[in-house]
A protein has these predicted regions:
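Bacterial N-terminal signal peptides
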Residues: 1-9
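Beta-rich carbohydrate-recognition modules and glycan-binding surfaces
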Residues: 71-72, 270-440
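Sec/Tat signal peptide C-region and signal peptidase I cleavage site
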Residues: 10-16
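GH16 jelly-roll
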Residues: 16-275, 420-421
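Residue-level signal for beta-strand positions within conserved beta-sheet cores that form or flank
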Residues: 12, 132, 226, 363, ...
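Glycine-centered loop/turn positions within well-structured domains
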Residues: 3, 195-197, 363
Length: 440
């Protein structure tokens, strides 16, 4: 599906003059208020090779990502690590900085990419499941076609991906720069407004895509906030290289970023998590009467989703006038989740997730929280740590220390409460009430 147009000459930019966000990488270390990491080989989220056949293991080690001479350095290395032949890093601002519309500028130096390195500077939407969340690729290098014609170190690509009638849709262009890109820094700019996305390198526009008034496509993916990603992959479908021996690019290879700057455009919105930190104390997730410093309001900033095999049942609440009470049939998994906008809950580190739960089921279930690191779960196995739960059909307070959740990023919480179970052997009735976060 092709819904955009590409231009060879730079048209007038809608660049505003108001700088609303920047990272100049001048600190002693990568700013954790802005950046977090994807770690692993993708298998942990069901996307081995990150869905692209990549051969690196992403880490958060300084060997792979650090500040050096006022620049962000992402370094790919040939080394055996966690069963993979290479290491590198992928940084993202998910849950920390998102924006909709604006002029985004980055000064980047790519490594020698031929053959096998794949530096990328891109964005993902904050809502939905790919491709329905939308993807904007501002710069990718090391593509197979450029390797084939000898322009790997001069050619870049830009693209957008979205959902079109339930299928993946794409639009992409490529541009061959007059000089090798690895010898110096180059300025990559995107202008994004309600009508169009444009991209340029060193003032030369090479991509334009209309995102309004397109027959048969809402393109809603490009009218919501996105977050940034920076990574240096090794191998994969984009490069056409799928064996370690095929990687001939010099290693270690470094992608360096001098700065990122966002200027405000008409209709723009910006979210910076550190400016919206939830106050310490108690934060109400699903509670009517608990004294809280802040709380979710369902239908406004939160939604309860019944994912599968849950039917409401009559049950008196533990408190107030509302309760989550459901029946799950035998033989089918069941689950629910409370979703909200990203929330910075850092003040609750060292605290606990508290709730009241009532059930008699002997089967295993798990309670979780979703953050920028993915899903984090605590299992409730008969005979194991029940965190206060007694399966006797009476209300009991359950208190789970946040430290019990593996790999939890409280600075970017998306699903504040989840409960999931594998198919039970017999029907289950379960009731949940008075759910809140308690700080230390």
């Amino acid at each position: 599906v092709l819904l955009g147009t590409a231009c060879a000459a730079l048209t007038p930019q809608l660049r505003a003059q108001t700088l609303v966000w920047e990272d100049n990488f001048n600190g002693p270390a990568i700013d954790g208020n802005t950046w977090t990491y994807d770690v692993g080989n993708g298998c942990q989220i069901g996307l081995c090779g990150w869905g692209n056949g990549e051969m690196q293991y992403y880490t958060s080690r300084p060997e792979n990502a650090r500040i050096e001479n006022g620049r962000l350095v992402i370094e790919a290395r040939r080394e055996a690590f966690q069963g993979m032949p290479f290491t590198s890093a992928r940084l993202k601002t998910e849950g920390r900085m998102h924006f909709k519309y604006g002029t985004l500028e980055a000064r980047i130096k790519t490594p020698v990419v031929g053959n096998g390195l794949w530096p990328a500077y891109w964005m993902l939407g904050t809502i939905g499941v790919w491709p329905g969340r939308g993807e904007i690729d501002l710069m990718e290098a090391g593509m197979a076609a450029a390797i084939a014609n000898g322009t790997a170190n001069r050619r870049i690509g830009a693209a957008v991906h979205w959902d079109y009638n339930g299928a993946q849709a794409d639009y992409d262009t490529s541009y061959t720069h007059p000089v090798d890109l690895h010898n110096d820094f180059h300025v990559y700019r995107m202008t994004w407004d309600p009508n169009v996305i444009r991209m340029s390198i060193d003032g030369q526009q090479h991509f334009e895509f209309a995102i309004s008034n397109i027959e048969g496509a809402s393109l809603h993916e490009f009218h919501q906030q996105h977050y940034l990603l920076l990574n240096l992959a090794v191998g994969g479908t984009f490069t056409g290289i799928n064996t370690p021996g095929g990687v001939t690019a010099p290693l270690p290879g470094k992608m360096e970023v001098d700065y990122l700057r966002l200027y405000q455009n008409p209709g723009a919105s910006l979210y910076v998590g550190a400016q919206h930190t939830a106050p310490a104390g108690r934060f109400g997730v699903f509670t009517d009467q608990t004294d809280t410093a802040a709380r979710l309001t369902f239908g406004q900033d939160a939604q309860l989703y019944l994912w599968n095999n849950l039917s409401p049942i009559a049950q008196a609440p533990f408190e107030g006038g509302n309760v989550m009470a459901y029946r799950a049939n035998a033989g089918t998994w069941y689950g629910l989740g409370i979703q909200t906008d990203y929330r910075d809950m850092r003040n609750y580190a060292g605290g606990s997730l508290k709730l009241h739960l009532k059930t008699t089921t002997p089967s295993t279930f798990k309670i979780g929280i979703n953050t920028s690191f993915g899903d984090s779960w605590v299992d409730f196995v008969p005979g194991g740590n029940q965190y206060g739960l007694v399966r006797d059909g009476v209300w009991h307070e359950v208190s789970i220390p946040f430290i019990a959740f593996y790999d939890l990023d409280l600075q970017s919480v998306k699903q504040m409460f989840m409960l999931v179970a594998d198919p039970p052997a017999s029907p289950v009735e379960i009731a949940i009430d008075k759910v809140y976060y308690q700080s230390r």
